[in-house]
């Protein structure tokens, strides 16, 4: 049986940009989305620029890869929030700039529309509590 790998704890973007060649989990607001395009290997790539309260400018560029166009993040508004787990921080432009890669093999993401609110992101347990603006009772989201 395969061993379950724990996701890295949730961190802020300003801390993530210092962790080159490491996998991180973070949450941010989508500031910009470039048009998805097909790669030479027939996978798809979508480039997002995200921000959080610690890194509002210029934001972090995240390249999201998937096998199909439909598996890419479907951003509706530029205030949507996105949670990434196990994205790899990397440098480019001779080490002057940092971006992140969301691999289709090890990374994942969860997208929250702008009217949803993050109530709490627990730094010790990687738990995220989201409110959708309704009076619905809380629901547990478990990972297997």
Swiss-Prot record:
Keywords annotated in UniProt: Chromosome, DNA-binding, Nucleus, Telomere
UniProt name for this protein: Protection of telomeres protein 1c
Bilayer-crossing regions: none
Misc. comment: POT1C is a highly divergent POT1 gene, which harbors multiple deletions within its gene body, and insertions of transposable elements within its promoter that probably silence permanentely the gene. Therefore, it is probably a non-functional gene.
Reported consequences of knocking out the gene: No visible phenotype under normal growth conditions.
Pfam families assigned to the protein according to its UniProt record, in alphabetical order: POT1
One term under GO cellular component: nucleus
Protein's GO biological process: telomere maintenance
Organism: Arabidopsis thaliana
Subcellular location: Nucleus; Chromosome, Telomere
Family the UniProt entry places it in: Belongs to the telombin family.
Molecular function in Gene Ontology: single-stranded telomeric DNA binding
Tissue: Expressed at extremely low levels at the limit of detection.
Role, per record: Binds specifically single-stranded telomeric DNA with weak affinity. Has probably no function in the regulation of telomere length.
InterPro entries: NA-bd_OB-fold, POT1, Telomer_end-bd_POT1/Cdc13
